[in-house]
């Protein structure tokens, strides 16, 4: 089946799973589900590939029937492999076979579960010259979305202009693959690999996965080798360092950032002091929002504390326990709000270190988010009077340059890359905070890198429509090298956390995505798929003749340079391809990392019709003999046509064979 032959606007290709009992001889109680990866297919006929899987397992089970019964998934389209119920003895036998690349136990992976498109510069007006129009709104681009495959009954998904909201590539088509189940939305590695295999066979143009653990999915390597870009979310475990997921170089890993919209609400205290918070609290018809309500201090608002107080009908001030590193404030808000509601409280004022994430007000009562400075003022007022009162007014909307944006979200997972230190991750940041998303029966503000991932997927669809001959590596390069490292006021982007800081490449990769600049990057850092295969074989697969390669992963031609171990001098090579004006000359500009000298040879690159590809060398010299952490800089190639091709530099000086820091 080829999806290109379908005329429907939205295609749903749901995966279904079967729950079954395995009781045949050869599959004993100790058997577990394993993924056996065999690499490229040896046959073009999928049925022959599956037959080869049966043939491989038959000696292990004693009969073909039992071998067939053991297989849960046969990967036969984009690559070769299978998921089967195996015991430890069978696993050892398979692992020793020369044509078996890997045998890994099936794992569960967590799903990383409007105005944002205008903020990104994708103007929907007909006279706009943005990437949206240049890319024909993503027309006929098929996006394979691999996740929980939920059917959302909402007219926004109507394919015939009946929707009430728009996306980034509104004329693209969707192929939805179900690989995740359960209330917590956990995704089976075996099912995810099967979904990738089917997506390749179905002819999708892009694969989007808001799921953790891409290094466990070798199928994505085959997708990219076939010209299919793969977009992953970075994870929601920030701001802790080395928390980023999906760390292989062939995928686009997306961090989350804020947008230029906020919903302030006025909190009026009984002494007439007016303070600002954030909320999506709105006035319910016939409710008396002019009334003041008794205000109490609920501290962390655990159920025990609230039970000891009489909070019935009152508004409670609660604090997020920020003493716990890496705790996501959204979890604690829900916990506190539910406790307040259960104890009879009318509403909640919740204090945390960032107020950009919006939550629905539980029970229809008033709620507001405040930072700790505001909370301390409220707390001081509570203990200054015998009858503290408060009124939370309905929120209103502010958008545009009045709102400082973007900022990297506190929850967005951070680098450095925990698996491959010489590869920068995440790759890019995009809108992922308080995004209006369609749900059953309406809309809801949602936050997460799972919100940021679809933004980049939509932009990739537009780029693929505009430049159908570009490889996945070229598209990724265009996105990263044109990204912005400054906010709407030209000030360096900040990263939220404890404390807030100036963002660096470990927070946002190349920067915050700029779709319109990505349409015309000037130069791209392209990569031969064979180089990805070598990377896989030397890091995740068979490792023959890889000793020198593994120590220099930073030589892969990605649009960034990360060297974790500069002792004295390290030289790195990069190659760029001209996709701009045929006759052009680029000059290099370096912002060196602190404590490092950077030399570029040559510092001029000239292109013409016969010279479209150029290689250059970047040499890093350690100026200080101190065991340190990473410092950051950039290398930019600029021409006379306003092309500015910037890649981030992340360098760590070491004097011993160990690393003093990870951040």
Region annotations inferred by a language model:
Residues 2-663:
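Loop-rich non-cytosolic ectodomains and luminal regions
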